Amino acid sequence: MSSLRPEEARKLATAASVSPLSNCQFSGVVISSIADEQKLEFTNKYKGSCTLLCSYDSQGVVLRVVSDDDQSHVLKEYMIAADTDAAQMGRRSYAVSLDADNLVLRFASDQDQQLFRKVVENVKHLRPKSVFSQRTEESSASQYFQFYGYLSQQQNMMQDYVRTSTYQRAILGNAVDFQDKIVLDVGAGSGILSFFAVQAGAAKVYAIEASNMAQYAQQLVESNNVQHKISVIPGKIEEIELPEKVDVIISEPMGYMLYNERMLETYLHARKWLKPQGKMYPTHGDLHIAPFSDESLYSEQYNKANFWYQSAFHGVDLTTLHKEGMKEYFRQPIVDTFDIRICMAKSVRHVCDFLNDKEDDLHLISIPLEFQILQTGICHGLAFWFDVEFSGSSQNVWLSTSPTAPLTHWYQVRCLLPMPIFIKQGQTLTGRVLLEANRRQSYDVTIDLHIEGTLISSSNTLDLKNPYFRYTGAPVQAPPGTSTQSPSEQYWTQVDTQGSRNSSSMLNGGLSVNGIGDGMDITHGLMHPH
């Protein structure tokens, strides 16, 4: 076998060590079908030679076949997985069984055949299940990476002004932590955080992305002429190898209720590449939990379940499913936003230290609760939100999803109790929230609450993987009973005040319609009463 040229050797090394399932392509490949296995007779499957496009996928490598003459049209797409049958045939040919096709691929060079063989071997064997694969169902992983492989989903996150601008401010405001440093971007997506690191002066950024978004990130890197700074590596951080340790790890690993999607475990796993005294952006996360009262939300979910209480729905008795319907609706966490005045006590804060906590710490999270109730009412459940801090050498920056902060794409989350509890001001509400990780990249959330000194308690278990997205974009309404003055009188006082101003304006040439000046926005008082 002839020796490899430096460029081929570099490509092989990259495929084998930096990214075991890296993207690559092979031109001038002649593809034949095995027509008769006994006689080893072959027929050309496609007219002329083809190009094979290999791209990383969470389940293996996607192999796309296109014509050398027209690469815009995909002739066939295959998946090379761990159970794919394949064998070398001579120096330039490779036999592989894909779907129902038994193919022989004849490559343009010995080196191309070697590289393709290395790609297949890296998928097929010798790699024990990674930490990620052990904790994640294949179907969940496939859906997860497919979801984040869409540009529209990346756009949704990038257009979250609070999220994106806070990350940029945290990184650029601590340029001393990035100047001439080696940076690791975990779950890079479009690569936007990698670009921020380069803006702050990073010498090198390794952008790790397991979804097909990696190819788009590479396009952005090349079109912005920063390929000498940013290296996009397709793959999971649990599976890839880096050529060196890093000074800083950046990532956006937070999900609903901070922990959903279990990306935080991946973020903590990445510390194996962090130098001693290295930085993590963000540095820690605070999960806030508070009891809330919201009769409207509770009634909404309860009435949905009552659909199954009909005894004559088109002549069919549905009532046997009412109990299960009720259970299903109340197992759904509610994703929306609310006025913080519905909270009946100061929030309890649970801290996750990204620099020191271990991955195993996030498999079972037990949070003790103790609330001093500030207002009498009915507790319908618990509200959750989170803040994360970027602890830099120059400044600390916070990203908050609190109901008192500008709204983000994380919103807030509320977990209802099927049996609400009446509680009085001054009483103590105790209990526990238990987050139990599952292989669907989420958590089962168990809530237990008890009014101290009584026999009154309530509990529920919810499926964080299956939330109800309730947010409609409508303005958040103040809780009932929070007005301490007559809203009607407040409004008309405002009208009178603005009318007087407009009368004064008329004396200086202003116009008036029905006694109300043209400079007055009467909808403001209706939509935003003080």
From Swiss-Prot:
Gene3D superfamilies: Hnrnp arginine n-methyltransferase1, Pleckstrin-homology domain (PH domain)/Phosphotyrosine-binding domain (PTB), Vaccinia Virus protein VP39. GO terms for cellular component: cytoplasm; cytosol; histone methyltransferase complex; nucleus. It is an enzyme of class 2 (transferase). Belongs to the class I-like SAM-binding methyltransferase superfamily. Protein arginine N-methyltransferase family. The dimethylated protein is the major form. Homodimer. The keyword Cytoplasm applies. One of its GO terms (biological process) is chromatin remodeling. Methylates (mono- and asymmetric dimethylation) the guanidino nitrogens of arginyl residues in proteins. May methylate histone H3 at 'Arg-17' and activate transcription via chromatin remodeling. The keyword GTP-binding does not apply. Pfam families: PrmA, PRMT_C. Residues 141-450 form the SAM-dependent MTase PRMT-type domain. Keywords: Chromatin regulator, Cytoplasm, Methylation, Methyltransferase, Nucleus, S-adenosyl-L-methionine, Transcription, Transcription regulation, Transferase. It catalyses: L-arginyl-[protein] + 2 S-adenosyl-L-methionine = N(omega),N(omega)-dimethyl-L-arginyl-[protein] + 2 S-adenosyl-L-homocysteine + 2 H(+). It is found in: Cytoplasm; Nucleus. S-adenosyl-L-methionine binds at residues 154, 163, 187, 209, 238, 266. This is Histone-arginine methyltransferase CARMER. Its main location: cytoplasm. GO terms for molecular function: histone H3R17 methyltransferase activity; histone H3R2 methyltransferase activity; histone H3R26 methyltransferase activity; protein-arginine omega-N asymmetric methyltransferase activity; protein-arginine omega-N monomethyltransferase activity. It comes from Drosophila yakuba. The modification Asymmetric dimethylarginine is found at residue 501. Its EC number is 2.1.1.319.
